[in-house]
Amino acid sequence: MKALNDSYDVVVVGAGPAGSMASYNASKNGAKTLLIEKSQEIGTPVRCAEAVPRLEDFGINPDPSFVKSYIRGGYLIAPNGKKIVVKGGKTDGYVVERKVFDKFLAIRSGQAGTQIAVKSRVTKIEKTDDGYNVFVNYLGDEYIVKSKIVIAADGVESNIAEYAGLKSKKNPKEICSCAEYEMTNVKLLNNEMMEFYFGDICPKGYIWLFPKGDTVNVGIGVIDSKKRAIDYLDEFLTHPLVEGRLDNAVPVEFKVGGDPVGGPIKKTVADNIMVVGDAAGHVSPLTGGGIGLSMDCGLMAGDVAAQSIKAENYSEEFLDLYEKKWKEKYYKLLMNDLKYKNILQKLSDDELNAIANSIPENLEEVDVGKLAIKIVAKAPSLLRHFKELL
């Protein structure tokens, strides 16, 4: 196996979608790039529901090797069983096999020129006059590699950003605990529609059913200390809302993880470093979804890294172009989603039912701000929750 070089233009830590897209764009634009992944196999372990937006928007062909289902929309299901159908262009997407998809993104990066080090761990980084010394345990051997730019894409528990003095540690109260079964013999409402369930069955979160070809991802995300996520999920499997639809369901895989739903970190750049993906809080606080957002922000980080190398300017002032780019496109959306999440977490089952009865049964998208007017008009008692949106 090829040893690591003494120096690189860019070192990306973490080969999830954000890291692979960042390294891909950095390499494609001429930067000598190293991508470091702690797992021995990229894409494992899988920790999410595996839904992604339209891949065509990223110039990626939705290959059947990793695309398991085409998604046209979803059902929002209130505690009383009332269904709201959300279906339109913005809701189109796919459910993928993350083990294959993540590896595909890494292969694509490798083909663009990135060197990839799997089963490798960054133990620390040290600031130098012109970049960072990155300490790497690579297949059991210790290396110190120099890098002009470091991109921290090392997930929700990011240490790399912390090493650089950027505050990336997440408040435990803002980490959504997730558990998921991949199951066969599940009867879906529609094989091209996702299902979302809300209420006391999943405190401060939701339960999802995502079509995945011959299987279905049945999962939950909760922010609650009374019971484990898996306990709530097991109770749901026999809940009247899904009566007769999961009776013969058989699990073929089990996944757990944590989702940062407290919004983006305050600062994602400093001299010689950028933070991206879950490490940066590039996750919707409302839905917990973040693959597409992380991919896009990864592309931005890789592009700015390559520009930085060409300009021989690795300062915070130069790299701030990355922060300006992602904030211009996503910051308002993320902060609005944080506001909506905080409102929805306070709602009782009766109030959720009242909302379901107040809004149209068919929507093209879920815009909580716009829906608030209709909700309050039909259920004035909910004004105390939604008044800041009016």
Swiss-Prot record:
Keyword Membrane listed: no
Reactions the enzyme catalyzes: a 2,3-bis-O-phytanyl-sn-glycerol 1-phospholipid + 8 A = a 2,3-bis-O-(geranylgeranyl)-sn-glycerol 1-phospholipid + 8 AH2; 2,3-bis-O-(phytanyl)-sn-glycerol 1-phosphate + 8 A = 2,3-bis-O-(geranylgeranyl)-sn-glycerol 1-phosphate + 8 AH2; CDP-2,3-bis-O-(geranylgeranyl)-sn-glycerol + 8 AH2 = CDP-2,3-bis-O-(phytanyl)-sn-glycerol + 8 A; archaetidylserine + 8 AH2 = 2,3-bis-O-phytanyl-sn-glycero-3-phospho-L-serine + 8 A
Enzyme class: oxidoreductase
Domain of life: Archaea
UniProt keyword annotation of Transmembrane helix present: no
Cofactor: FAD
MF terms in GO: flavin adenine dinucleotide binding; geranylgeranyl reductase activity; oxidoreductase activity, acting on the CH-CH group of donors, NAD or NADP as acceptor
Pfam family membership, one: FAD_oxidored
Its biological purpose: Is involved in the reduction of 2,3-digeranylgeranylglycerophospholipids (unsaturated archaeols) into 2,3-diphytanylglycerophospholipids (saturated archaeols) in the biosynthesis of archaeal membrane lipids. Catalyzes the formation of archaetidic acid (2,3-di-O-phytanyl-sn-glyceryl phosphate) from 2,3-di-O-geranylgeranylglyceryl phosphate (DGGGP) via the hydrogenation of each double bond of the isoprenoid chains.
Protein name as annotated: Digeranylgeranylglycerophospholipid reductase
Organism: Methanococcus maripaludis (strain DSM 14266 / JCM 13030 / NBRC 101832 / S2 / LL)
